[in-house]
Amino acid sequence: MDFDLEQQARESLGASSAFPLGEPNTAFAQHFIGNSFLAPLAGGVANVTFEPGCRNNWHVHHGERQVLVCTGGRGWYQEWGQPAQELHAGDVVDIQPEVKHWHGAAKDSWFTHIAIAMPVKGCDEQSNEWLEPVDDEQYGKLA
């Protein structure tokens, strides 16, 4: 990821985010369309920043809930078989275990959220199952 992209993110979200941008999200890049940044904040809590048009693949969290606290920009969240929900700073999404979903930025906006992994009580193993990319045509229809 080049300096220009990082500078764009800082300029676009700098005033609206109290959290660090983090580093290029290379560890999970194969599960994303576009570039993202990851800033671990504490055990199971991270700030994730998406460039315009960036989104993660459909995926499922096994053995844990995921809570997204939107902190800047404009993005999308969608559960399999449901319409996409537009997200803005202040929105909170509570994703139950075993729910197939994706989330990411709008086409024309940087987007950032805090992702919180919450293990299910009594469940010893947590994992993410990464699935197919979000269909470009369907994503392109989002306003």
Please provide the spans of the model-predicted regions:
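Conserved short histidine dyad/triad with adjacent acidic residue
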Residues: 46-62
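A short, N-terminal "cap"/entry segment at the start of jelly-roll beta-barrel domains
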Residues: 1-44, 128-143
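A short beta-strand-loop-beta hairpin characteristic of the jelly-roll/cupin
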Residues: 55, 62-89, 99
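Short hydrophobic/aromatic-rich beta-strand segments that constitute the beta-sheet cores
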Residues: 39-40, 77, 113
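A short hydrophobic beta-strand segment most commonly corresponding to one strand
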Residues: 67, 94, 108-129
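Conserved metal-binding segment of the jelly-roll/cupin
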Residues: 50-53, 87-108, 118
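Residue-level recognition of conserved beta-strand positions in structured domain cores
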Residues: 47, 60, 71, 79-81, ...
